[in-house]
A protein has these predicted regions:
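Glycoside hydrolase catalytic-domain context in secreted enzymes
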Residues: 2-226
């Protein structure tokens, strides 16, 4: 399309419409303006899984926790795809991308349905704590089925495909927001936290970290869970 003149609002209009509500500004500018208007207590309230509403600024409450490791979880009826360990066994990253794309489409629909019912509860948002890209070496760990197995390269490849499928390819808007978890050497059998001390620097950099690096650099994953 064509544009003429400055698209920024006039000073008169700017006085009427806060920057954070003005779509002529970038997301970064709008977010910075919104945060600058918050009190310390309001900022802190946004840093939890259950973020409170800020009525005076028109900010609704939001529940960040949703899951979609192999389908939309806990938010009504949705397609259940094979567990990630099964998807990894196909060695087909194009298939994994297709699965993730279908999941995010359903996520969008379920999000809109929940909002129309006035449902703002947990598991109804567009921020998903998926995929799990931990390295599965020890079968005693009870969450191995959530991962893509023990190989760092395969985990990276599958994880990148999954994130791209979830988040979509629109240059401006996310379809949904993915979250790579759990950073970083999380996937070991242990009765306490001492297990982590057994991870060598070599193992950390060659085995546990490559998938996280790939998802950040190649897939622009929206967030990482510590």
């Amino acid at each position: 399309g064509c544009s003429s003149g400055n698209t920024r609002p006039s000073e008169e209009n700017a006085a009427e419409v806060p920057v954070y509500l003005d779509t002529n500004y970038s997301f970064r500018e709008r977010a910075a303006d919104l945060v600058s208007r918050m009190t310390l207590e309001e900022k802190v309230s946004q840093m939890c899984t259950d973020a409170d509403s800020i009525p005076r600024l028109g900010v609704p409450a939001y529940r960040w926790w949703s899951e979609c490791l192999h389908g939309i979880a806990r938010n009504g009826n949705a397609t259940v795809f094979p567990m990630p360990i099964g998807l990894a066994a196909t060695f087909d990253d194009a298939l994994v991308h297709e699965v993730a794309d279908a999941i995010s489409t359903e996520g969008r629909v379920l999000f809109e349905m929940a909002r129309k019912r006035g449902n703002l509860s947990k598991y109804t948002g567009l921020t998903y704590y998926s995929p799990s890209i931990n390295i599965f070496r020890d079968p005693r760990w009870g969450r191995g089925q959530e991962t893509y197995g023990e190989d760092p390269f395969l985990t990276s490849t599958m994880g990148v495909a999954y994130v791209k499928g979830l988040q979509g390819d629109d240059p401006k808007y996310l379809k949904v927001a993915a979250c790579a978890k759990h950073y970083a050497a999380y996937s070991g059998y242990s009765h306490d936290a001492k297990w982590f001390s057994n991870t060598t620097d070599v193992d950390m950099y060659q085995t546990y970290l490559p998938a996280f690096k790939a998802l950040v650099k190649e897939a622009d994953v929206e967030s990482v869970m510590g």
